[in-house]
Structures are given as structure tokens and as C-alpha cells.
Amino acid sequence: MSSAATSGEYWLISVPGEKGANDAWDKLNRATGNISTNSKYLIPDLKVGTLDQLVGLSDDLSKLDTSAEGVIRKLVQYFTEVLEEDKSKIAENLVIGNKDMKTYVTKFQWEGAKYPLKQSLKVLSEIIGKQITQIDNDLKMKSLAYNNLKNALASMDRKTTGSLLTKDLADLVKAEDFVLNSEYLQTIIVVVPKILVKEWETKYATLSSMVVPGSSKLLTEEGEHALYTVTLFKKVIDEFKNIARENKFIVRDFVYDEETLKAGRTERDKLLAEKQKQYAPLIRWLKINFGEIFSAYIHIKALRVFVESVLRYGLPVNFQAAVIEPAKGQSKKLRQELQKLYIHLDGSAAGPIDTLEDSPALMSLGVNEYYPYVFFKLNIDFSNK
């Protein structure tokens, strides 16, 4: 079936094996091949252990599954944030080695180097659990460090935006706008509403005594305000501020100091350089660790299918696992076909059990919906819940 007509949702199922190696697979394909795309889910022979161990492990794996998906979602969300203007490139970065998610799932191969088959199911689940915890912790640390840089930069940039009443004045003033190094005189900055500009120019020199006549100079106009300088004696500044405020002229708390302004610009340049320095390694880390945790996630699914299959179908281990992608709009029909095909596996099942309150055994296994065959849903769209 054409992949273009698939739904993007995956069903991981297993059914009992039959006498011939491919009999169960052929039977599944004959019944569903025109309404789904099917791939073998190649789960190797794993160490079974005891029934009690399997029951306990089923619950542990359910929790591990939820944990892994949660960390993947956090990582993908953060990856998208870090890409900023390149958000559209998120999909091409969500790869496992050189495989996209769909290819990795539909052509799954157990990674024995990471998860040795000689280990028990319990040990394998612990290996994966530690891996998830490590990636989660590393993600928190790396995102904290990078976010601190971003927030510091954003805080500095916010000061350069907004109105003349609040924004940083460093880029709006020059040394020649001020009387500097005077024992008695000081130049101050005043924000004047545009509708009061004529009034300011007429009366600023008379707002208090000791204002230098002709000293007011327009620096810039933005939005509803104009920015002026005025020079006066230091000892009347407080008086001037109060009278100016009564006339709706706002004196900014600003003293021109070249070293302070230079230090501010240098600090921003340093922060920006550090952010750019951290960007590429962070992108690389996110890409690699997405691959690591997604791989771990699909191995958890494989463990769950294996454990549930042994609990359902018993020993010796003989089941056929499959990755099924329903065709668009065919999920209901596919479910019906699977029900007809495997109803004999559960004589009491006239249909799926949607409410499990009367089945504590199934609830204890973390099963939320029940079918005559082993079933887990897989969603690889991590952009939203």
C-alpha cells in the first residue's frame, strides 16, 4: 500500500506463531494488506525468567515507557526552541543515526551492543532506565546554562526597546550632548510628550533657577515622545525634576559615563558570542541524544511486546510481532479485521474491553485497552501531546 495513504499512527501487535515460520505473518498480511502497511517487528529471543518476574516487569516497563516518552517530548520541544528562526528544520534533525523515525521503527533491529541479549529482561530495563535518567538530567543542565544566556541577552535587548520613558539611552546619546567633568553644571535627559514640545521649548529655562538658557537640545523623537537635554546647576536638579514632573516632563535617571556605556556594550557582545559558541555543540548534543532516547524508547516497546506476548501466549516463546500503520480513515475497519482474525485467541471477547475495572489483573499490567492480541499504540509525532 502507498505510504502516502497511511495515517502516521503505528500499532505494535503480536499474535501467536504458527507451524510455518511465516504462516502467522502471511495470514496477517492477507487479511489487512489493503488497509494497512505492515512491517515485521524483529524482536530477538530474550531471557524469559519466571512468571512473577514478568508480571512485575510489565508494570515497570509501562512506567519506563511513559518516562521515556516524556523526556522525548521535552527534548523535542527544547530542540525546537533552540532552533529559533530555523524551527522548520526540526524534522530533519530528529534522526536515529542516518534513519528517520519511521524507517527506524518499520525496519527495527535490536541493538545488541547497547542492550546485550545475554542480560535478563530486568537488567535490560535497568540499562534503559539509567540511560533515560542520564539524558533527562543532562538536558536539564544544558538547557539551564543556555537559557541563562538567552535570558540575560533578552533582558539587555528589552532595555533597547519600548518607549523613551524606559528604554536604554546608550545608543541615543553621544559625549558631545553633555557638559562633562564640571564641578557645578550637569546635563540631564528629559522625556517630553510630543504634544508639549512647544511648551517645553518655551518654558524649560524658567522651570527653576540656575538653568542654562539655550542649553536644551532635541536628541530624538520616537512614538509619542521627544528626548531633550538641558544643562543646569547640580544643586537645583531635584527641584527641577519635581517642577518638570508637575508639567508632565519626565527627567530620566541617567548620567553619561563612557566607561559604563562601553562596559554594557562589551557585556552584550560577550553574551552574544558565548551564545553563538554554545549553539552548535548544543544542537549536536540534542540531535545525538534524540537518537539515543528514541532508540531506547522503541526498545522499551519491544520489551513490552515480548513480555506481554509471553504472558498471553505462554511458553515456549513463539509469536509474530508486527508494526502496523493503518491507512487513512481505515483504523476502524482494520480493528474489525484484526478482531475477526484473532477472536479465537480469547473466547470471551466479543469485542475489545474498553473498561477494565472488572479486570484487576489486566489493570495491574498497565493495560488500558484490551484486544485478543497484544497491542500497543505508538505515536511518533512529538510536537504536541
Swiss-Prot record:
Bilayer topology: Peripheral membrane protein
GO molecular function, one term: proton-transporting ATPase activity, rotational mechanism
GO BP annotation list: embryo development ending in birth or egg hatching; ovulation
Function, as annotated: Subunit of the V1 complex of vacuolar(H+)-ATPase (V-ATPase), a multisubunit enzyme composed of a peripheral complex (V1) that hydrolyzes ATP and a membrane integral complex (V0) that translocates protons. V-ATPase is responsible for acidifying and maintaining the pH of intracellular compartments and in some cell types, is targeted to the plasma membrane, where it is responsible for acidifying the extracellular environment. Subunit C is necessary for the assembly of the catalytic sector of the enzyme and is likely to have a specific function in its catalytic activity.
Keyword Ribonucleoprotein belongs to the record: no
An example Gene Ontology CC term for this record: vacuolar proton-transporting V-type ATPase, V1 domain
Family according to the record: Belongs to the V-ATPase C subunit family.
Location in the cell: Cytoplasm; Membrane
Pfam families, per database record: V-ATPase_C (PF03223)
Protein known as: V-type proton ATPase subunit C
Keywords, comma-separated and alphabetical: Cytoplasm, Developmental protein, Hydrogen ion transport, Ion transport, Membrane, Transport
InterPro entries attached to this UniProt entry: ATPase_V1-cplx_csu, Vac_ATP_synth_c_sf
Gene: vha-11
Extra information: Vha-11 and vha-3 are transcribed on a dicistronic transcript where vha-3 is the upstream transcript and vha-11 the downstream.
Species in which this protein is naturally found: Caenorhabditis briggsae
Highest taxon in the source lineage: Eukaryota
Subunit structure: V-ATPase is a heteromultimeric enzyme made up of two complexes: the ATP-hydrolytic V1 complex and the proton translocation V0 complex. The V1 complex consists of three catalytic AB heterodimers that form a heterohexamer, three peripheral stalks each consisting of EG heterodimers, one central rotor including subunits D and F, and the regulatory subunits C and H. The proton translocation complex V0 consists of the proton transport subunit a, a ring of proteolipid subunits c9c'', rotary subunit d, subunits e and f, and the accessory subunits vah-19/Ac45 and vah-20/PRR.
Keyword 4Fe-4S included in the entry's annotation: no
